Amino acid sequence: QKKGFQSTALAQSVLAAAMNIEDLTPILPVVKEIGYKHCALQVLPEHYPIVGENLLAAIQEVVGIDENHPIIQTWAKAYGVIADAFIMVEKEIYEGMAWDGFKPFKVSKIETVTPDIKAFTVTSETQDLSQFTPGQYITVDIESEKLPYKAKRHYSIVDGGKDFLTFGVKRDVNEGHEGEVSTALHDEVHEGDTLYLSAPVGGFKIHHPERPQLFLGSGVGITPLISMYRQVAGDAVSAQMIHVAATETAAAFVPELEHITASGKNNHLHIHLRDREGYLEADELKMYLSDNTEVYVCGGTAFLQSMLKSLQALGVEQERVHFETFVPRLSVPV
């Protein structure tokens, strides 16, 4: 939010609706991706008029016009269309979620994975936690003495079973600014504590499991890919994982990746260390690709843009490339 991603995504959503006002079909996939985030945060239909009222008031203030101006009426119509689309999509998502709202879970284990990544395992005696699709994420609702409000953040599921879920959290430090929630989780949450989570959601998942699978994860972007790699390892024609890290110390979940790789003869793992090998380039990617490989990418914005550009240059069709971002998708220029 402090980096402006949320406001950019909202503006882009309304603009996209205005440009496709007669037929929203072209933007429905993006609407669904955003809808997953909304459902994770428990956004409800009654919240949309509140957002719309404040959005239109902001436009009036910035442009210097009143509420009866044709521009405001036009944007009100565009917002109404996009709000209705979100409400429709989110109704379906809510119906498929494993539980309603935020439920309490016990933190049974905290593991330091790298100097800035921790893995949190939560358990439940009453809730079946196996109902998730590899690639999905949970949402943590947390209170901290250092925060003036309750805060919610999404974290990708690394592993899960009937009575446990494990998710990874990177301490977010960017230009001297520490992420408030990730810092609270790292510094204030201990084994035995309680965390409140909403049910797993997300559309990042395996496509065409009968085809070769290639996973490209940089930094903490490896987290959703681990459960996806685990899902296909041993069964896929080929399952290849490339984990890009700045240094050997920064490489995350390596023992788990090695364990998964050992489960099948068609699995392959490469830990790409930038301090030794430089950036991952198209020439190296080329040897991991076949004519029908499904590719999954997750990492920071620069890594994501670089990989998508390289894959396009290598002739990989857009429909075979799947990616996840840790910021609102419409705020990422890809």
Segments and roles (model prediction):
Residues 41, 172-175, 202:
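A short acidic, glycine/proline-enriched capping/turn motif at secondary-structure boundaries
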Residues 7, 51, 180-334:
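FNR/FR-type flavoprotein reductase catalytic core
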Residues 96-194, 244-248, 258, 274-275:
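Ferredoxin-reductase
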Residues 85-86, 115, 332:
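Short, well-ordered, mixed-charge alpha-helical segments that flank or form enzyme active sites
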Residues 1-102:
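Globin-like tetrapyrrole-binding proteins
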Residues 43, 47, 67, 177, ...:
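Catalytic cores of large soluble enzymes that bind and process phosphate-bearing ligands
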Residues 65, 147, 207-208:
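Surface-exposed helix-capping loop/turn segments at secondary-structure junctions
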